[in-house]
């Protein structure tokens, strides 16, 4: 009995967090909110905007703030994602962080076996959809070639300005969508390190954690999020120039700030893998060398003691 009471304690119950999106063309937000409340959502985040707009700052912040054990709840799948592949990307990222997803009007609940099966069916549908699109595109190109016509967009071939602008705008929208989905995996680290650390060091730390950034691509990504008011302008401030001997101290401090749970030995191992030479020679980094650099960083206020 004591075990049952423990398992049913409020601290272990899942937090149901709702997300409602309404466009100017579909003003049904109250109905969404009512359904989410009836489902037990104790917090509901509401997004307002044009149906044509891909920027969703409320959703971006919500995805970043969700914690392990939370359940993100929507009324319908189309309230969260614009396509099956986009939906699967979002859910996959949530699952990696221990966050579940539920759609009230669809058989999707990733905290249950049946819901996960439905999600796998959706994945198969998305794969089939991509294959059919590729097959139709290939057939269309072959038919056009047989009729002596060039495949592709006539407006682009003729360099019509309106066609070029439309394609450029579509690419920018797709780029922003990808950034918003992925930002929760890298933007918190950028926020902790910039602008006190150089872009070079930020990129090296992110890439050690499984990312694949270059300085140019990361700066462009942060610029875009700042422009959309999804990130703080201070992230783009110029880093102060530091003497060369300052480099190792700041790199070690950056690694420690990015992941406070790392031990001195863990940081030393990362520095070895990054092929950074120890400050006093030798072939491998020692925890004592890491400790000395962290003490120095603490003295100037770069990290907390």
Swiss-Prot record:
Catalytic site positions: 23 (o-(5'-phospho-dna)-serine intermediate)
CDD domains listed in its UniProt record: SR_ResInv
Full protein name: Probable DNA-invertase y4cG
Signal peptide: none
Entry's Gene Ontology molecular function annotations: DNA binding; DNA strand exchange activity
Superkingdom assignment: Bacteria
UniProt entry keywords in alphabetical sequence: DNA integration, DNA invertase, DNA recombination, DNA-binding, Plasmid
Matches recorded under InterPro entries: Recombinase_CS, Resolv_N, Resolvase-like_N_sf, SSR_resolvase
Protein family according to the UniProt entry: Belongs to the site-specific recombinase resolvase family.
Chain ranges of the Resolvase/invertase-type recombinase catalytic domain: 15-148
PANTHER family per record: DNA-INVERTASE FROM LAMBDOID PROPHAGE, SERINE RECOMBINASE PINE-RELATED
GO biological process annotation, one example: DNA integration
Gene3D superfamilies the UniProt entry points to: Resolvase, N-terminal catalytic domain
